[in-house]
Structures are given as C-alpha cells and as structure tokens.
Design a protein with these regions (language model features):
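Short, glycine-/small- and polar/acidic-enriched structural segments
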Residues: 4, 8-147, 152-156, 163
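Pocket-lining segment of extracytoplasmic ligand-binding domains
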Residues: 70, 161, 169-265
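Glycine-rich phosphate-binding "P-loop"
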Residues: 37-39, 168-171
C-alpha cells in the first residue's frame, strides 16, 4: 500500500445495468472510498468535456470504468495505461432487421444487398459502428457468408458519441433513441437492412414494423454473441492499479456486495 494521499477517485459506467452502477446506486462505492477519506467523483457527470471523454479513452488518472469493451480495447491499443481487473457478461437482444418491402426474409437474402452502418466523426472511438460491424459479421456467419457478400453503406451521423457542448445532466452524451439515421435511411430506401441491439433495438423494430432477419443475441455459440456489450470490462488506470492495489481490492469487494444484494432482491 502506498503512502500517497488521495483526495478523490473517479469512476464511470455505461448507461446500462452493471454491477458498478448498482454499487453506486446503493451507496456502496461512496461508502467504500469515504472510509479511506477519498471522495467519489463521476466522470460522466462532470461539466468538463476533457474529463467526460475519459469515459471513452481512459486518460484520467485515479479512475475506473465498467462498460462496453470497445473503448478500453481502443484506448489500450493507443497506448493508454489502462488495466483489466474484471469481466461481466450479460446477454442481450442482437438482430438484423429490415422492412417488409425489401423482400429480405433470411440471412441468405442479404447477399448482394445494402447494409447500413452509421459513421460518426473521427475522434472519440465510434463504438456504435464497431458494434454494428460485429453484429453484421455474426449474422452473416450463420449462413456461411461474410461482410464481402453485402454492400456496406455508410450512414452519416453528424454528432460524435461525446457532445462537448452538452448538458452535464445528460452525461455529455446524446440520449435520444438510437438508430435514428439508419432507420430514416431504411425508410427512404437508401439501405436494405441494419443491426439493432438491446431493449432500444426491440423498441425500434416494433415501432417500424420490422422483419426480423436474424436474432442471435442468445445464440449457443459465444463467438456469435460476443460484441461490444458482451462482455463488459472493469478497467482501472495503471497508476491506481500499481500505487493503490488495496483500493482496487476494495472496489471489487463493493461490486461483489452489490451482486449479492441483487441476488437477494
């Protein structure tokens, strides 16, 4: 244990159910670090965009994150000193959908058709695009096809995943329903199919009366199911891991407490 005195520690999580989110809501995280004289600060609640972007690129010292795996993988590949300390896996709805008028009814029907994938501005990692690409690859593999068997059409999205001018109460993220641009392109006939996931994906599919081309979020093969949210990663910055491993241990204890609470309720 280091003698270095800390006054605050930063945390962040994706806006989906996670053990870290539950531990924060139950007060376990704040209680854990308060016992060490350390204040708990939320990265995504900060009014400072430079701090909020650490949710995606893990640039902030003395911080930890629990969420999708694409940002930490990208951050690590770019030389960020981030360390993996835990993995959770929660399966969710993943599907390729289309509209009735396209005539697409199965994965094999996707061959030669236009698959729309959103493309956001360069800068912060476009994890939405990575997620859709993996979803496409998984769906096509069910019928022995690859991404080369379809025409990938970029659907331009003006906003980055991080809105630097956003209201901090929205965590600096665009909280409008997802897939808006892709759905619009689908309705205009500019593309033939898209990937959706999670409860928002179910809502979108029902809203437009979509045809379910492939549903693989609960497939028996984990290589098919794996995507940005499966698994989710618990990461800490290198300084925290090396200088205060005792705090990392306390963090994991708090997360386990939240898990036990969830099992009991």
């Amino acid at each position: 244990m280091s003698d270095e005195k800390l006054s605050e520690i930063w945390y962040t999580r994706c806006p989906v159910p996670t053990p870290v989110g539950l531990a924060a809501q139950l007060g376990y995280l704040e209680e854990t670090f308060a016992a060490e004289g350390i204040a708990l600060r939320s990265i995504i609640d900060s009014p400072d965009p430079a701090i909020r972007q650490s949710h995606f690129n893990h640039t902030l010292n003395w911080s930890f994150r629990h969420g999708g795996n694409v940002p930490p993988i990208r951050a690590r590949s770019e030389g960020r000193k981030t360390r993996l300390v835990g993995i959770t896996w929660t399966d969710e709805f993943q599907a390729v959908i289309t509209l009735p008028q396209t005539g697409i009814r199965s994965v094999s029907d996707l061959k030669g058709r236009r698959f729309g994938i959103a493309r956001r501005p360069e800068g912060i990692v476009d994890f939405h695009r990575a997620t859709a690409l993996k979803g496409l690859v998984s769906a096509l593999s069910l019928e022995g096809l690859s991404h080369r068997d379809v025409e990938i059409v970029d659907v331009a999205v003006r906003d980055s995943v991080l809105d630097k001018f956003g209201d901090a109460s929205l965590f600096g993220l665009r909280r409008r329903p997802p897939h808006g641009e892709e759905i619009a392109a689908l309705i205009r006939g500019e593309i033939d199919a898209i990937f959706v996931k999670g409860t928002p994906g179910i809502a979108v599919a029902n809203l437009i009366g979509a045809v379910l081309v492939a549903d693989f979020g609960f497939h028996s093969d984990p290589n098919i199911r794996v995507n940005s949210g499966s698994p989710r990663l618990l990461t800490v910055d290198e300084l925290l891991a090396e200088k205060r491993p005792d705090l990392v241990a306390r963090l994991i204890e708090a997360i386990f407490r939240a898990s036990e609470w969830a099992k009991a309720h």
